[in-house]
Swiss-Prot record:
This is Protein RecA. Can catalyze the hydrolysis of ATP in the presence of single-stranded DNA, the ATP-dependent uptake of single-stranded DNA by duplex DNA, and the ATP-dependent hybridization of homologous single-stranded DNAs. It interacts with LexA causing its activation and leading to its autocatalytic cleavage. SUPFAM superfamilies: P-loop containing nucleoside triphosphate hydrolases, RecA protein, C-terminal domain. The gene is recA. Residues 328-349 are annotated as: Disordered.
């Protein structure tokens, strides 16, 4: 038995010498037992994700119909990372990012790294270089459907390019997944929806880019508009449902409902009010909302406005919600140290 133990110890030392410290270990000896996360910027989504935000070092896919709020969800994650002193990058393959809207959502556009690549290969190579630097906390690729292979761009309009994009995504994710995990970068891929032709039974909807992204994603979010929010006769936003379709770090299939207000993004006050009402932290009597025997307002929109004008009350309610769900605020953003980066295998630097 001792000979086997000695042989195993020698093998482990050899592996660590060749591939770096931490390349193999016993599961219980891992330095970080708890999943390290960064808040999504939406309280309801943090709760639905089960761990208080997006897990670091993982691939996230956000998909849904057009104008459902996919890019808004991703921009809120960028704003949250920047608020905590982290670095973010946005690969704009659709060439459609609105800097004015991003700024309104809290994104520091002066610090945001932006690339508008010409081809899918270029986009993914830029993403790979940024991830391997070890200095990026979140990178957003918008969108997978717009990652057009070079052969398709250089070819004629009517040419058939079957499976090219799927092959590109499969190859890219094989290379990226290890580097994403080592560098603790959150990679958010935004995706569109297509319909499969001739499907008689079941859901005909599918996402472009093949199956690879579905497999490599630790979290998949489906974003859909539920209803239009009105103030009088004016349409002011959308109530949006975000369903956690896949989750490798917590139980899946939870759902978050958020208000996406036009020109403002996800309403923090709306999420606080809805969740606090469910937990009876905020009491609702008829149309009136009250907290600590103080009336917040008559009707949901008035109560939201009160919380916007009184951030102290909103903070107190939010802290009680986080305490109830065991979400102890945002987790600090830290880039890998020079020592950690030196430990990476050469092919992951």
């Amino acid at each position: 038995m001792s000979d086997r133990k000695a042989a195993l110890d020698m093998a482990l030392r050899q592996i660590e010498k060749q591939f770096g410290k931490g390349s193999i270990m016993k599961l219980g000896e891992q330095a970080e037992q708890r999943v390290s996360t960064i808040s999504s910027g939406a309280l309801a989504l943090d709760i639905a994700l089960g761990v208080g935000g997006y897990p670091r070092g993982r691939v996230i896919e956000v998909y849904g119909p057009e104008s459902s709020g996919k890019t808004t969800v991703a921009l809120h994650a960028i704003a949250e990372v920047q608020r905590n002193g982290g670095q973010a990058a946005f690969i704009d393959a659709e060439h459609a990012l609105d800097p004015v809207y991003a700024k309104k959502l809290g994104v520091n556009i002066d610090e945001l790294l932006l690339s508008q690549p010409d081809t899918g290969e270029q986009a993914l190579e830029i993403a790979e270089a940024l991830v391997r630097s070890g200095a990026i906390d979140v990178i957003v690729i918008d969108s997978v459907a717009a990652l057009v292979p070079k052969a398709e761009i250089e070819g004629e309009m009517g040419d058939s390019h079957v499976g090219l994009q799927a092959r590109l995504m499969s190859q890219a994710l094989r290379k990226l997944s290890g580097a994403i995990n080592k560098s603790k970068t959150i990679a958010i891929f935004i995706n569109q929806i297509r319909e499969k032709v001739g499907v008689m039974f079941g859901n005909p909807e599918t996402t472009p880019g093949g199956r690879a992204l579905k497999f490599y994603s630790s979290v998949r979010l489906e974003v859909r508009r539920a209803e239009t929010l009105k103030q009088g006769n004016d349409m002011v936003g959308n109530k949006t449902k975000i369903k956690v379709v896949k989750n490798k770090v917590a139980p899946p299939f939870k759902q978050a409902e958020v208000d996406i207000m036009y020109g403002e993004g996800i309403s923090r006050e709306g999420s606080i009010l809805d969740i606090a009402s469910e937990l009876d932290i905020v009491q609702k009597s008829g149309a009136w909302y009250s907290f600590n025997d103080e009336r917040l307002g008559q009707g949901r929109e008035n109560a939201k406005q009160f919380l916007k004008e009184n951030p102290e009350a909103a903070e107190e309610i939010e802290s009680r919600i986080r305490e109830h769900y065991g979400l102890n605020g945002e987790i600090e953003v830290e880039a890998p140290s020079e020592e950690e980066f030196e430990d990476l295998p050469l092919d992951l630097k």
